[in-house]
Amino acid sequence: MKINILTLFPEMFDIFKHSIIGRARENGFLHIETVNIRDYTLNKHKKVDDYPYGGGAGMVMTPQPIVDAIKAVKEKNKGKVIFLGPRGKTFNQEMAKELSKEEELIFVCGHYEGIDQRIYKYFDLEISLGDFVLTGGEMACIPVIDSISRLVPGVLGSEESFQDESYYDGTLEYPQYTRPFEFEGEKVPEVLISGHHENIRKWRRKESLLITKERRPDMFEKIKLSKEDIKLLKSK
């Protein structure tokens, strides 16, 4: 997958040079490039923002630099243009799955008080992280790209790595334990050291369902429970 990020702060995405995403880039599974919107401004002072018509606090990003940057990237990349902003659809795992199937994606990060309304017609999709305010689109773009990237084949090395994670199948993940067996008087559940893989699978599924029911009843209501799920929930 190829990802282009249009931003005023390319250095903020250096985080993708490290860890799993960094290795995926080195191995050719991901190609991430940043484009500095400021490089496309025609203003001799390199300004990319101006005062809003009608008055108001803050500055608004002007249309020319962003639109020209989008057009330049689109000449070589045919991916969807995605804007990170409060009006967008709330991002979730299902959206991450769908976007991970794309070969190319183009992200546009806004800043200041927002962007000129005339830019919006260039976006194929608008995404929001939720009902809260961030300093800029970069802050939202990083977790969105990370979530999408880890679903791209080859990035995690094994599909099983993300299939057991929270949200993948509509449930929260089951509890995890590691050494030592006993810590501050609390022991690891016996089933996890039994070596009985089927019992371990059932325990994990039951715990996942119970945690989801308790912590996220809104998610639990959407789960299509199997006969086994119902039996597990009724068991002691």
Swiss-Prot record:
Main EC class the enzyme belongs to: transferase
Record's keyword annotation contains Glycoprotein: no
Subcellular localization(s) per the UniProt record: Cytoplasm
Primary localization: cytoplasm
Hydrolase in keyword set: no
Documented EC number(s): 2.1.1.228
GO cellular component, one term: cytosol
The organism's place on the tree of life at top rank: Bacteria
Reaction it catalyzes: guanosine(37) in tRNA + S-adenosyl-L-methionine = N(1)-methylguanosine(37) in tRNA + S-adenosyl-L-homocysteine + H(+)
Binding site for S-adenosyl-L-methionine: G110, L129, G130, D131, F132, V133, L134
One family name in Pfam for this protein: tRNA_m1G_MT
SUPFAM superfamilies from the UniProt entry: alpha/beta knot
GO biological process: tRNA N1-guanine methylation
GO molecular function: tRNA (guanine(37)-N1)-methyltransferase activity
Keywords: Cytoplasm, Methyltransferase, S-adenosyl-L-methionine, Transferase, tRNA processing
UniProt cross-references to PANTHER family, sorted A to Z: TRNA (GUANINE-N(1)-)-METHYLTRANSFERASE
Free-text function comment from the UniProt entry: Specifically methylates guanosine-37 in various tRNAs.
Similarity section: Belongs to the RNA methyltransferase TrmD family.
Subunit structure: Homodimer.
HAMAP family, alphabetized: TrmD (MF_00605)
Name assigned to this protein: tRNA (guanine-N(1)-)-methyltransferase
Annotated organism of origin: Clostridium perfringens (strain SM101 / Type A)
